Swiss-Prot record:
Family designation: Belongs to the TrhO family.
Enzyme Commission code(s) on record: 1.14.-.-
PROSITE patterns: RHODANESE_3
Species in which this protein is naturally found: Bartonella bacilliformis (strain ATCC 35685 / KC583 / Herrer 020/F12,63)
Protein name as annotated: tRNA uridine(34) hydroxylase
Active site feature: 179 (cysteine persulfide intermediate)
Keywords on record: Oxidoreductase, tRNA processing
Function summary: Catalyzes oxygen-dependent 5-hydroxyuridine (ho5U) modification at position 34 in tRNAs.
Gene giving rise to this polypeptide: trhO
Enzymatic reactions: uridine(34) in tRNA + AH2 + O2 = 5-hydroxyuridine(34) in tRNA + A + H2O
Domain Rhodanese: 124-219
GO biological process: tRNA modification
HAMAP family (UniProt xref): TrhO
Single GO molecular function: oxidoreductase activity, acting on paired donors, with incorporation or reduction of molecular oxygen
Length: 305
């Protein structure tokens, strides 16, 4: 399958007092170059995932890294066979990754970075507690062998999980954390350091860097890695999984899930069928119909029809 679109996942923590002034130039540049995705700007830095042609993404990265505060972003590239986003959004936020705890600053204190090549040895050590900092639906698709699942719906719930599991967290000599691309672990390990935990580690570049770097036969990763775009999830080598999202609840569906009698495109799946009222389902049907009409109009305009 031809990989047409370059996907860039990036973040950089910084003390960015003028972040509001970057919104319009970034949005204009993305629109001019056909780039789609989401970029978040806050006083604490930039975070986002975008996709476009190779040349367009290179133009954007040059623009971002020309900003003195963003000269060395954490940057991860992959490829997609079709555009994985519907539009471009450049948003102003209080945090570039929302934990909801005041005063957490990865620029001041953060866990020790561990390269993918050294990760296996760390998490196989009996004195290491391995913690998956992602949400429950992400964990469901895949995780590292032996990792603890906090069973959280959003990253905001992570501090409360830590508070409720102090005894478990203190049983082992060290804590190793991981997430998709690394940004949540910047916050989570900084938070743990603030609480007094000393030996805190996290996977540099996140799961995506690990899946790209470590050969499948040596990997301790089991399953797929959820990504927040239309690819839904990726496997070793960052190959697309072929999954799709339920548009009603955003549950990741494989081929088997789409064969269920509860599955209706844009309306329901096994995960949400019994939780939705008939009114909700009718509303979702209308939303899906409007989406299909808009999609058809866009295709026709591109074809000059």
């Amino acid at each position: 399958m031809e990989k047409k679109f370059k996907v860039a996942a990036l973040y950089c923590f910084a003390d960015l007092k003028h972040y509001q002034k970057l919104q319009k130039p970034l949005l204009d540049l993305c629109q001019e170059n056909g780039i789609k995705g989401t970029l978040l700007l806050a006083k604490e830095g930039i975070n986002g995932t975008v996709a476009g042609s190779c040349a367009a993404i290179e133009t954007l990265v040059r623009f971002i890294t020309a900003e003195p505060a963003f000269q060395t972003p954490e940057l991860k590239y992959s490829w997609a066979s079709k555009m994985p986003f519907h539009r471009i959004k450049v948003r102003l936020k209080k945090e570039i990754v929302t934990m909801g705890v005041e005063g957490i600053n990865p620029l001041k204190a953060v866990g020790t970075y561990v390269a993918p090549e050294d990760w296996n040895a760390l998490i196989q050590d009996e004195e290491t507690l391995v913690v998956d900092t992602r949400n429950d639906y992400e964990y469901m698709l895949g995780s590292f062998q032996g990792a603890v699942d906090p069973n959280i719906k959003t990253f905001r719930e992570f501090p409360q999980w830590v508070a409720n599991h102090q005894d478990e967290l203190k049983k082992k000599k060290r804590i190793a954390m991981f997430c998709t691309g690394g940004i949540r672990c910047e916050k989570s390990t900084s938070y743990m350091r603030e609480l007094g935990y000393e030996e805190v580690y996290h996977l540099k570049g996140g799961i995506l860097q690990y899946l790209e770097t470590i050969p499948k036969e040596e990997s301790l990763w089991q399953g797929e890695c959820f990504v927040f775009d239309e690819r839904v999830s990726v496997r070793h080598g960052l190959e697309e999984s072929g999954r799709e999202l339920c548009r009603a609840c955003r549950y990741p569906l494989g081929a088997e899930g789409k064969l269920s009698s509860h599955y209706e495109e844009g309306v329901s799946c096994d995960a949400c069928y019994d939780t939705r009222s008939e009114f909700d389902k009718q509303r979702f049907r209308e939303r899906h119909r409007q989406f299909q009409l808009a999609k058809a109009r866009t295709m026709n305009s591109h074809q000059g029809l």
